[in-house]
């Protein structure tokens, strides 16, 4: 389990920190070009597949919280990655996950709390560029405070399947309503 955690943390850190460094090394070895030079040909999609922003499939409710799957599936075994967008004034309720998850804040400010009690004044700002570990089986909740100028956008990576459990004010799992 420790190996998996360290591997996943390495993936998040390498993505956040290492990729820009490698890009600088690659650029230093190639011919110099500026943004005023003509662009090169599009990359071969069998080498570097890309998805344009307008083609990203978002789920959820715009203006509240949205998610876009990057790879994998959090409900199935294996590595998964999602982008989460928290709009200002929206939060989850206190809960925990049965698997560790790793977050990198891309933009905005992500507000988090480890309190069992929902009180937005207990949230703490996690700013763009920060890496956070969502420890398994520990209560937290998150979102974006009212008054933020932009949504909090983060990449979340974990191992599936992951189960999310809502908790009461004592940190105990809430009863799951019976299936209809």
List each language-model region with its residue ranges.
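Short acidic-glycine-tyrosine-enriched beta hairpin
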Residues: 116-138
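Conserved short histidine dyad/triad with adjacent acidic residue
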Residues: 80-97, 135-137
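Glycine- and acidic-residue-biased ligand/ion/polar-headgroup-sensing regions
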Residues: 87-90, 97-117
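Short beta-strand His + acidic residue motifs that chelate non-heme Fe in jelly-roll/DSBH
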Residues: 92-94, 112-113, 134, 139-147
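C-terminal segment of classical bacterial N-terminal signal peptides
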Residues: 15-25
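Double-stranded beta-helix
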Residues: 47-49, 133, 141-180
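Positively charged n-region of N-terminal signal peptides that target proteins for export
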Residues: 1-6
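A short, N-terminal "cap"/entry segment at the start of jelly-roll beta-barrel domains
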Residues: 29-80, 169-180
């Amino acid at each position: 389990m420790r190996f998996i955690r360290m591997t996943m943390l390495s993936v998040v850190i390498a993505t956040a920190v290492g990729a820009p460094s490698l890009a600088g090394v690659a650029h230093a070895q190639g011919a110099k070009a500026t943004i005023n030079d003509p662009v090169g040909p599009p990359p071969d999609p069998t080498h570097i597949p890309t998805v344009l922003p307008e083609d990203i499939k978002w789920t959820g409710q715009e203006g509240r919280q949205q998610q876009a799957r990057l790879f994998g599936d959090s409900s199935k075994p294996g590595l998964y990655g999602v982008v989460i967008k928290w709009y200002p004034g929206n939060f989850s309720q206190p809960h925990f996950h049965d698997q560790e998850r790793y977050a990198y804040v891309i933009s905005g400010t992500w507000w988090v709390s480890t309190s069992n009690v929902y009180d937005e004044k207990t949230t703490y700002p996690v700013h763009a560029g920060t890496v956070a570990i969502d420890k398994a089986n520990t209560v937290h909740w998150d979102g974006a405070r009212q008054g933020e100028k932009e949504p909090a956008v983060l990449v979340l990576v974990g191992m599936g399947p992951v189960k999310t459990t809502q908790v009461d004010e004592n940190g105990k799992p809430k009863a799951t309503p019976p299936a209809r």
